[in-house]
Amino acid sequence: MLILFNTFAELPEAYKAFAPTVDVLPLIPLFFFLLVFVWQAAVGFK
């Protein structure tokens, strides 16, 4: 099963230049999640 996931984890050759961007993409929802807490702290958790 691990071999199957490893096969899909590699980007095609044409997209190798975008590898650093693709590595950061999963973190974007986490930034929004943290932004919710910062926003609520700013308005006093109403």
UniProtKB/Swiss-Prot annotation:
The lineage of its organism: Bacteria, Bacillati, Cyanobacteriota, Cyanophyceae, Synechococcales. It is a single-pass membrane protein. The chain crosses the membrane at residues 25-45. InterPro entries: PSII_PsbK, PSII_PsbK_sf. Residues 1-9 form a propeptide. It is found in: Cellular thylakoid membrane. PSII is composed of 1 copy each of membrane proteins PsbA, PsbB, PsbC, PsbD, PsbE, PsbF, PsbH, PsbI, PsbJ, PsbK, PsbL, PsbM, PsbT, PsbX, PsbY, Psb30/Ycf12, peripheral proteins PsbO, CyanoQ (PsbQ), PsbU, PsbV and a large number of cofactors. It forms dimeric complexes. One of its GO terms (cellular component) is plasma membrane-derived thylakoid membrane. The keyword Plastid does not apply. It comes from Prochlorococcus marinus (strain MIT 9301). GO terms for biological process: photosynthesis. This is Photosystem II reaction center protein K. Disulfide bonds: none annotated. One of the components of the core complex of photosystem II (PSII). PSII is a light-driven water:plastoquinone oxidoreductase that uses light energy to abstract electrons from H(2)O, generating O(2) and a proton gradient subsequently used for ATP formation. It consists of a core antenna complex that captures photons, and an electron transfer chain that converts photonic excitation into a charge separation. Belongs to the PsbK family. Pfam families: PsbK. Keywords: Membrane, Photosynthesis, Photosystem II, Reaction center, Thylakoid, Transmembrane, Transmembrane helix. SUPFAM superfamilies: Photosystem II reaction center protein K, PsbK.
